[in-house]
């Protein structure tokens, strides 16, 4: 019975880490949408017409960057090794740091509300997600996984 309880607790911890990274990814998407709307609004206010500010490459970049945020959430769910959890921690932390740094830079250029949105929507959930990933990484034995054949 104890093994079953340990297995369920480890599974719950992995799911909690994945959920926290998804909350952080959602916050990043909200921040990016607010930043884009603010940028377009400033372009319209300054010139009276909306120029084509985003080309096809910029839109692809936005889609790819928003899609990369799913990787830190998926790794703890599908992998049983600590290397995957470490990769989730490192990639997620890197994404949080770069998004917040970009948000602070854009906040200096476009207004304080952009920086505040980056801090509230990305940094705050990112700290909790990184902390949960670190705790999961420090667990002495984490045998639970959702896919038994995973070799990551």
What residue ranges belong to the model's regions?
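Membrane-water interface at the C-terminal end of transmembrane alpha helices
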Residues: 123-147
